[in-house]
Amino acid sequence: MALYAIGDTHLSLSSNKPMDVFGGGWEGYVDKLQKGFAAVGPEDTVVLCGDLSWGMSLEEAKKDFAFLDALPGARKLLLKGNHDYWWNTAAKMNRFFAESGFSTLRILHNNCYEYGGYALCGTRGWFYEEERGGHSAKIFNRELIRLEASLKAAGEREKYCFLHYPPLYQGYRCQEILDLLHRYGVTRCFYGHLHGGSHRLAAVGEQDGIQFRLVSADYLRFQPEKICD
């Protein structure tokens, strides 16, 4: 068994928003994803760090979920990204996956999963692009509550945290999220969201005792990052 992570697959098999139009590394990205997942074994776990489908509803994203479900891996843990407009309550999503026969898809939201003694925790997170104030402050506070709920669910196990948004970026620090990571003893943090020229500005490596890693699909050349066996 092995644990992998990748984010920002931006699938659009049912909607007209293919990422190929951006050129560069995104050309033929669906085929690249399929080839990249060849490294994943049938018993492996893959954490998908948000921005998975351009579908506006669960039904519209169904072909994208079918694609993800058919890829190698026993479990794919789905995290919410800022473009996952199909996202719904956990109960509705789990019911939809069950009724659709998507047996490998799981929701990582207010909970955690175990992998080989590690606790896999996470939430969407927060980024400086989203201004705070009024409604945004409520959303930000909910994200903190969700992350803490996930970390608490892990108990005393060593914790790996998966976010969509980077908690660090150039001079930006989401201090409230970083404080939670330190308080609960998170040792490794994986995130997506950044594309293109933003890759070179990403926080990668150890900072303040936590190992940070960018796992956006285009950064990884569409091959999931192996975290551990």
Predicted regions mapped to residue ranges:
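Active-site metal-binding loops of divalent metal-dependent hydrolases
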Residues: 7-11, 50-53, 82-84, 111, ...
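Short, flexible loop segments at boundaries between secondary-structure elements
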Residues: 187-202, 219, 223
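Structural motif
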Residues: 3-5, 47-49, 120, 160-162, ...
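Short, charged, surface-exposed secondary-structure boundary motifs
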Residues: 87, 117, 189, 221-226
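Core catalytic region of metal-dependent phosphoesterases/phosphodiesterases
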Residues: 2, 15-115, 173-186, 208-217
